[in-house]
Amino acid sequence: VIEEKLNEGEIERIPVEGVTVTATGASGVVTGITNEDGIISLAVIKTGEYKVAIDITSLPDGVTPQSDRPTELTINFDTGATIGSGERKVSLFVGDDRASGSGRWEQLPQTLVNGIKLSLIISMCAVGLSLIYGTTGLTNFAHGEIVTIGALVAFWLNKYGFGLHLLLAAPFGIAASALAAGLFERQVWRPLRRRGTSLTSMMIISIGVAISVRYIYLFFFGGRNRRYNEFVGTPEIDFGLFGITPRDLGIVIISSVTAIGVAVFLSKAKFGKAIRAVSDNPDLASATGINTDRIILIVWLIGGALAGMGGLMLGASSGVQWDMGNIILLLMFAAITVGGLGNPYGALLGSFVVGMFTELWTWVFPNVVELKTLGALMALVIVLLVRPQGLLGRKERIG
């Protein structure tokens, strides 16, 4: 038994556990309950015609039948229709009607809502990456792994460690990402800067670090996509033109408040002004008495915390997996390039452009949603053709 959901333009299929399924036929009535993989095995002793049906009342809260998909199927179980050693495999689908196909214009409002949500998730991850680039000049390909570790720590506490509600596990995940970012700065990047290592070499090192850490995640976490306890089968709030789950509504609200808070911090707070000063001219900032090493460490901690929050939002939206940070890394780089390299406000604006283009791509080309990242690349190309320095970037003379 599989639940179909329309998630960010793609049809997401999730196994449904605990659903009662019956097979009625020559052997009488045989009943069973699906396991955590949505699978049930029913043993029958006679060949012939069987009706396989879902007990609708056993579906989890928030999971409903699709209007255009049957919840029961009739199969002819005989030697000519068997698979393997006397087995017959049947898939039954439930879930979101929009996942099974509807008019394109009917899907546009939902696509725009998904675009806003994706934009805000990208912005949480990209602002830190932009701040790090602005203060150090480092193109950090390991930033995706900082995104991932926050989601993994929160998942472990939520699912296995203490069974904490996600709202209680989230601060630990955010702190883990901030701590990881701070350790990277103190133990890897600061020593390399003091040795005079070139930015190109440091970028290559970051690629190696990213690959190494990513496969450590795979070894301990495994390759499955998993979900937080609170977000299995959550009901959707129907607003007519579009629907949104309480989970996604929470993502939009929390991300929006955080983005506004970051913008206010950078423009009004003392540390925020110092960060912008170091980003604009590190040598001049140091000459005026600003401790640049301290500011850079603070930038890494803030960037890591924001990345951890972005990872939590991404995990709540699409599930937690070992390479989730790497999956969104291209969108992060596209966002900070579109907005203007090293400009955190540009990262926020660029994230909106990239997120909306990515989701609208799936609306314009619904049959090639696997290539949805092309939407982000198209946004990048179009903006750079018009403004090579990015939307909020500054022109600089080269050579």
Where do the language-model regions lie?
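Short, ordered, surface-exposed loop/turn motifs in non-cytosolic proteins
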Residues: 2-26, 36, 47
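Single transmembrane alpha-helix segments in multi-pass membrane proteins
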Residues: 111-155, 183, 187-197, 201, ...
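Alpha-helical transmembrane segments within multi-pass membrane transporters and channels
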Residues: 163-209, 349-354, 358, 387
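Short, acidic Ser/Thr/Gly-rich low-complexity loop/linker segments typical of extracellular
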Residues: 27-43
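Cytosolic-side transmembrane-helix boundaries in multi-pass membrane proteins
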Residues: 79-89, 291-294, 365-399
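Helix-loop-helix "hairpin" substructures at the membrane interface of multi-pass membrane proteins
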Residues: 243-320, 349
